[in-house]
Amino acid sequence: MRDYLKEKTFVRFPGGECYEILGMIGEGGSGLIYSAGKVVRQGENYVKENSLRFALKECYPISRQFNFLRMQSGEIVPENESEAAANYLRCVASMQLNEGQMTSEIYDSEAIRLIPIQRIASSVEISFDKGQHFHYVNNAFTVMASMENKGESIASWYQKNGRYTMEMIFRVIQETLFAVREVHLAGYLHLDLQEGNIFVTGQPTDESLTCFLLDFGSARKRLADGLCAPVGDQPIFSSEGYRAPEIVGIMTGETPDFRLGPEADLYSIGYLLLYLLTGRRYSTRMLEDVRKSYDTSGGGRG
């Protein structure tokens, strides 16, 4: 389990722009996502600039190959010193910093159901005493546009009240499909869709419901044929259960040159529907066992 930054931690970007952590609101395979408010210096102290909330993403990956931890200073480092682990962390940070360009291209395509990135930094200053003392950490951070009117993650929304009708759940899935379609039409695959990085706002009982996507750390550009280039040795992040079989094949090395397409995102949405309908989480192995059982019983025959 990753150790997240606690509430009231200050994160200061190069140039002096400073944010106060208000709590963790989501997580993906490549990092943690916090709710934050902007603070400004007033005399010897920092004060809240306004009531707007932003999303801060911190590079803190989960990997099958390497383990990472947070030092007392707040910096994310490999658990065991190795050049390979350090290179992996640098690669993930670089991918996160490239999110700005990707989300900008998607947003410029008239996509409205995503939260674009406003600021990026390969290192920041952190304060654990409300801005009295800061120190540098080599943690990559990005600031996403204001979270005002963007609601809450599906994870939070779903846990608040278990009394959801089929119609409400299917409306959320429909809105998620609309959001993912915008990404696909803009020429990208998301590849890390899960309940923690899909935000829902409005009422699930009427037309006001809208879903927004964030965390494009795993996103890949689609080529002319609609597929992305082979991932190769680059990290690819996806969450357990939501991970399409073809992504599993890439991660295990069974099909390293497989080219991913839109169906990988659709698989993740299918798993989201399963989770919302049952309230249960299924591992990749559990889903594979169900599939094999279905095939063995003859359920797949027409």
Specify the residue positions occupied by each region the protein language model found.
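Conserved structural core of kinase catalytic domains
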Residues: 115-163
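Activation segment signature within eukaryotic-like protein kinase domains
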Residues: 172-173
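Catalytic-loop of the protein kinase fold
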Residues: 184-202
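Activation segment/activation loop of eukaryotic-type protein kinase catalytic domains
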Residues: 196-241
